[in-house]
Amino acid sequence: MESFGIIILSQVSIKSQDNHRSETISQALFGELFKIIEPQNEWTKIQLLNDGYIGFVQNQQWMKIDNFDNIEFYCNANSANKVKSNLSKIRIPIGANIWKNNGNHPVLSKFTFSKKVKNKILSKQSSQKQV
């Protein structure tokens, strides 16, 4: 069975090999989805779903999505905003995707979205529903 993951940092380098000195072949933003090809101790070989790039990311830069078939697009960050994880705040870059599960909750449940971000999401959803 295929496994999938999601990037949980603002910006992540996709490396050609499983080490820090290898070439950066692409970058992924917060919320980008990928297929897990080969998990390892410190690095995981992945394939980005949006453009098909294959490379390695560090294991602490992503999290596994358990119910991949149950998620759908939530919104696209149209301005830079911050979210809080259990440990720190990170900035969501413009263009980052936020996904939801069937319960309409953001997939990244370990993150707390600020009131400002939630209001933008809600206003965007209501304007889309009216169309």
Regions found by a protein language model. Give the residues of each.
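SH3-family beta-barrel domains
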Residues: 1-18, 27-28, 37-40, 47-49, ...
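Intrinsically disordered, low-complexity polar regions and short flexible loop motifs
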Residues: 21
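A basic, amphipathic helix-loop patch mediating RNA/tRNA/ribosome contacts
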Residues: 24
